[in-house]
Amino acid sequence: MLKKMGEAVARVARKVNETVESGSDTLDLAECKLVSFPIGIYKVLRNVSGQIHLITLANNELKSLTSKFMTTFSQLRELHLEGNFLHRLPSEVSALQHLKAIDLSRNQFQDFPEQLTALPALETINLEENEIVDVPVEKLAAMPALRSINLRFNPLNAEVRVIAPPLIKFDMLMSPEGARAPLP
Protein backbone atom coordinates (compact mmCIF):
# COMPACT_ATOMS: atom_id res chain seq x y z
CA MET A 1 0.00 0.00 0.00
CA LEU A 2 2.74 2.50 0.95
CA LYS A 3 4.65 1.58 -2.19
CA LYS A 4 1.59 2.33 -4.34
CA MET A 5 1.08 5.66 -2.52
CA GLY A 6 4.71 6.54 -3.07
CA GLU A 7 4.41 5.70 -6.76
CA ALA A 8 1.32 7.90 -7.06
CA VAL A 9 3.08 10.84 -5.36
CA ALA A 10 6.13 10.39 -7.60
CA ARG A 11 3.89 10.32 -10.66
CA VAL A 12 2.20 13.60 -9.67
CA ALA A 13 5.58 15.23 -8.98
CA ARG A 14 6.93 14.04 -12.34
CA LYS A 15 3.91 15.39 -14.24
CA VAL A 16 4.05 18.76 -12.46
CA ASN A 17 7.80 19.08 -13.11
CA GLU A 18 7.29 18.22 -16.79
CA THR A 19 4.73 21.02 -17.05
CA VAL A 20 7.08 23.55 -15.42
CA GLU A 21 10.22 22.49 -17.32
CA SER A 22 8.56 22.37 -20.73
CA GLY A 23 6.59 25.58 -20.25
CA SER A 24 3.50 23.64 -21.27
CA ASP A 25 0.04 25.17 -21.03
CA THR A 26 -1.33 21.78 -19.88
CA LEU A 27 -1.31 20.05 -16.50
CA ASP A 28 -2.45 16.43 -16.75
CA LEU A 29 -3.03 14.76 -13.39
CA ALA A 30 -5.62 12.26 -14.59
CA GLU A 31 -5.75 8.88 -12.85
CA CYS A 32 -3.33 9.86 -10.06
CA LYS A 33 -5.54 8.68 -7.17
CA LEU A 34 -5.86 12.25 -5.86
CA VAL A 35 -8.39 12.87 -3.09
CA SER A 36 -7.63 16.60 -3.14
CA PHE A 37 -5.54 18.97 -5.23
CA PRO A 38 -2.05 18.85 -3.66
CA ILE A 39 -1.28 22.15 -1.90
CA GLY A 40 2.42 21.90 -2.78
CA ILE A 41 1.59 22.19 -6.47
CA TYR A 42 0.56 25.82 -6.02
CA LYS A 43 4.09 26.72 -4.93
CA VAL A 44 5.77 24.72 -7.70
CA LEU A 45 3.53 26.27 -10.36
CA ARG A 46 3.41 29.81 -8.93
CA ASN A 47 5.49 31.27 -11.80
CA VAL A 48 3.61 29.46 -14.56
CA SER A 49 0.02 29.17 -13.25
CA GLY A 50 -1.12 32.05 -15.47
CA GLN A 51 -0.04 30.21 -18.61
CA ILE A 52 -1.85 26.97 -17.72
CA HIS A 53 -4.85 26.76 -20.06
CA LEU A 54 -5.86 23.11 -19.64
CA ILE A 55 -6.00 21.02 -16.47
CA THR A 56 -7.07 17.40 -16.43
CA LEU A 57 -7.94 15.88 -13.07
CA ALA A 58 -10.12 13.14 -14.53
CA ASN A 59 -10.65 9.78 -12.87
CA ASN A 60 -9.30 10.63 -9.45
CA GLU A 61 -11.12 10.57 -6.11
CA LEU A 62 -11.71 14.30 -5.68
CA LYS A 63 -14.62 15.27 -3.44
CA SER A 64 -14.14 19.03 -3.79
CA LEU A 65 -11.98 21.77 -5.23
CA THR A 66 -10.91 24.81 -3.24
CA SER A 67 -11.43 28.46 -4.01
CA LYS A 68 -7.62 28.73 -4.25
CA PHE A 69 -7.64 26.30 -7.17
CA MET A 70 -10.11 28.49 -9.08
CA THR A 71 -8.32 31.77 -8.40
CA THR A 72 -4.81 30.37 -9.01
CA PHE A 73 -5.71 28.95 -12.41
CA SER A 74 -7.93 31.81 -13.56
CA GLN A 75 -6.58 31.65 -17.13
CA LEU A 76 -7.96 28.15 -17.75
CA ARG A 77 -9.67 27.49 -21.09
CA GLU A 78 -10.51 23.82 -20.37
CA LEU A 79 -11.07 21.93 -17.13
CA HIS A 80 -11.55 18.15 -17.09
CA LEU A 81 -12.95 16.84 -13.80
CA GLU A 82 -14.87 13.80 -15.02
CA GLY A 83 -14.93 10.59 -13.01
CA ASN A 84 -14.55 12.03 -9.50
CA PHE A 85 -16.85 12.42 -6.47
CA LEU A 86 -17.62 16.12 -6.85
CA HIS A 87 -21.06 17.35 -5.83
CA ARG A 88 -20.52 21.13 -5.96
CA LEU A 89 -18.13 23.79 -7.21
CA PRO A 90 -16.79 26.68 -5.13
CA SER A 91 -18.34 30.09 -5.85
CA GLU A 92 -14.90 31.24 -6.99
CA VAL A 93 -15.44 29.31 -10.21
CA SER A 94 -16.54 32.79 -11.34
CA ALA A 95 -12.80 33.63 -11.57
CA LEU A 96 -12.57 31.37 -14.65
CA GLN A 97 -13.64 34.10 -17.07
CA HIS A 98 -11.76 32.51 -20.01
CA LEU A 99 -13.09 28.97 -19.50
CA LYS A 100 -14.52 27.52 -22.72
CA ALA A 101 -15.15 23.89 -21.72
CA ILE A 102 -15.77 22.03 -18.47
CA ASP A 103 -16.29 18.29 -18.11
CA LEU A 104 -18.04 17.30 -14.88
CA SER A 105 -19.42 14.00 -16.14
CA ARG A 106 -19.54 10.95 -13.88
CA ASN A 107 -19.55 12.89 -10.61
CA GLN A 108 -22.18 13.27 -7.88
CA PHE A 109 -23.90 16.56 -8.69
CA GLN A 110 -27.52 16.62 -7.56
CA ASP A 111 -27.91 20.34 -8.25
CA PHE A 112 -26.87 22.05 -11.46
CA PRO A 113 -23.76 24.16 -10.68
CA GLU A 114 -25.40 27.52 -11.43
CA GLN A 115 -22.13 29.44 -11.02
CA LEU A 116 -21.28 28.17 -14.51
CA THR A 117 -24.03 30.32 -16.01
CA ALA A 118 -22.01 33.45 -15.13
CA LEU A 119 -18.99 32.44 -17.22
CA PRO A 120 -19.06 34.54 -20.41
CA ALA A 121 -16.74 32.40 -22.57
CA LEU A 122 -18.16 28.98 -21.61
CA GLU A 123 -19.12 27.03 -24.74
CA THR A 124 -19.39 23.42 -23.56
CA ILE A 125 -20.67 21.90 -20.31
CA ASN A 126 -20.63 18.13 -19.80
CA LEU A 127 -22.66 16.92 -16.81
CA GLU A 128 -23.46 13.45 -18.14
CA GLU A 129 -24.07 10.73 -15.52
CA ASN A 130 -24.82 12.84 -12.45
CA GLU A 131 -28.03 13.04 -10.42
CA ILE A 132 -29.35 16.39 -11.66
CA VAL A 133 -33.12 16.83 -11.67
CA ASP A 134 -33.57 20.53 -12.42
CA VAL A 135 -31.70 22.88 -14.75
CA PRO A 136 -31.78 26.71 -14.83
CA VAL A 137 -32.98 26.84 -18.44
CA GLU A 138 -33.49 30.62 -18.53
CA LYS A 139 -29.96 31.28 -17.22
CA LEU A 140 -28.48 28.81 -19.69
CA ALA A 141 -30.43 30.43 -22.54
CA ALA A 142 -28.86 33.79 -21.59
CA MET A 143 -25.27 32.49 -21.78
CA PRO A 144 -23.68 34.27 -24.76
CA ALA A 145 -21.15 31.62 -25.84
CA LEU A 146 -22.85 28.35 -24.83
CA ARG A 147 -23.01 25.87 -27.71
CA SER A 148 -23.57 22.52 -26.03
CA ILE A 149 -24.62 21.03 -22.72
CA ASN A 150 -24.64 17.28 -22.13
CA LEU A 151 -27.15 16.16 -19.52
CA ARG A 152 -27.50 12.55 -20.62
CA PHE A 153 -28.17 9.99 -17.89
CA ASN A 154 -29.47 12.49 -15.33
CA PRO A 155 -32.95 12.07 -13.82
CA LEU A 156 -34.18 15.37 -15.31
CA ASN A 157 -37.71 16.37 -14.42
CA ALA A 158 -40.38 16.51 -17.12
CA GLU A 159 -40.60 20.30 -16.90
CA VAL A 160 -36.99 20.70 -18.07
CA ARG A 161 -37.67 18.37 -20.99
CA VAL A 162 -40.70 20.42 -22.10
CA ILE A 163 -39.55 23.98 -21.34
CA ALA A 164 -35.94 23.79 -22.53
CA PRO A 165 -36.18 23.03 -26.27
CA PRO A 166 -38.05 26.18 -27.40
CA LEU A 167 -35.94 28.51 -25.23
CA ILE A 168 -32.43 27.41 -26.10
CA LYS A 169 -30.14 28.22 -29.00
CA PHE A 170 -27.57 25.53 -28.24
CA ASP A 171 -27.44 21.73 -28.29
CA MET A 172 -28.91 20.18 -25.15
CA LEU A 173 -28.26 16.45 -25.03
CA MET A 174 -30.69 14.48 -22.88
CA SER A 175 -31.40 10.77 -22.53
CA PRO A 176 -34.89 9.42 -23.06
CA GLU A 177 -36.98 9.77 -19.92
CA GLY A 178 -36.13 7.04 -17.42
CA ALA A 179 -32.91 5.99 -19.17
CA ARG A 180 -30.06 4.93 -16.91
CA ALA A 181 -26.35 5.04 -17.60
CA PRO A 182 -24.83 1.84 -18.95
CA LEU A 183 -22.92 -0.23 -16.42
CA PRO A 184 -19.12 0.13 -16.70
Swiss-Prot record:
LRR repeats: 51-72, 75-96, 98-120, 121-141, 145-167
Phosphoserine sites (modified residues): 175
Domain of life the protein comes from: Eukaryota
InterPro entries, per the entry: Leu-rich_rpt (IPR001611), Leu-rich_rpt_typical-subtyp (IPR003591), LRR_dom_sf (IPR032675), LRR_domain-containing (IPR050216)
The entry's keywords: Leucine-rich repeat, Phosphoprotein, Repeat
Any Pfam family the entry gives: LRR_8
Record has Repeat as a keyword: yes
PANTHER family named in the record: PTHR48051, RAS SUPPRESSOR PROTEIN 1
Protein name: Leucine-rich repeat-containing protein 20
